[in-house]
Amino acid sequence: LSTVEEALFLIQGLNAHDIFPDWIALNNGTTHGIEASGKGIQVDLTTSIHDALEKYRVSGAQHGTSGNSSDRLREIASQTRTTKANVATALQMVSWGLEVNDYGNAKLDDQGNFFKVRDQGMTEAMWSELVAYAQDQGWKGGNYKKLNLPFENKLLSQAGEIRNRMVKRVEEFIYNMLVNVLNAENTAPLTVAAILEAGSYDAGPKGERIEDPAQWTPEEIIKRGASISSDKGPEGDFDD
């Protein structure tokens, strides 16, 4: 897991050289795929790191949002400085027509197979083709996300009615997440106003240099980096 010390080392070093990131992504318990442990994102850890970076005006980018409960996502929205959330895996499963819970975690049977909802998402014939391909590759669970690339053209060549129902399913899922989980209801006018005020979609850097470049020379960076000690967790292959 990421630490306050590591995050400060990164952001302070960049700041000293006039680089002001809009976001920082942390290793804070996320799963890029399907969240199966029930632990998920560590909100307290995320909050402590974001608080330590407050004066650098860096927001949080939350990877691995898919599969974390709505309650945990509400905690992230209310307790941390997160303004960007990645939900790619959840949207993939939703668009395909798989059975998911209210926060996008696809349901699996005892053998690790997905449940396809009839007449939702892609056609049943297309789903059968995806499953057969995945079996040939030895893919299960979160590795199904790798199917998007080889099947992109086939998914896009389905009848308009099928493509539209895939889009509609994603639209409904995202609307619920934005409005009922992430507190984004009625924020579009605020975004439009900010864009108009800046005269661009790019509002420029939020931060400014407050670190002394003399303290962040290559030699000093190497020295500081060598003094950082943190628990990297157990060794092993944790690919999902």
Regions found by a protein language model. Give the residues of each.
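Glycine-rich phosphate-binding active-site loops on the catalytic face of alpha/beta enzymes
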Residues: T30-E35, Q79-E99
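Structural alpha-beta junctions
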Residues: L53-S59, R81-K84, N180, A184
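Hydrophobic faces of well-ordered beta-strands that scaffold small-molecule active sites
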Residues: D22-L26, V58-H63, T83-V87
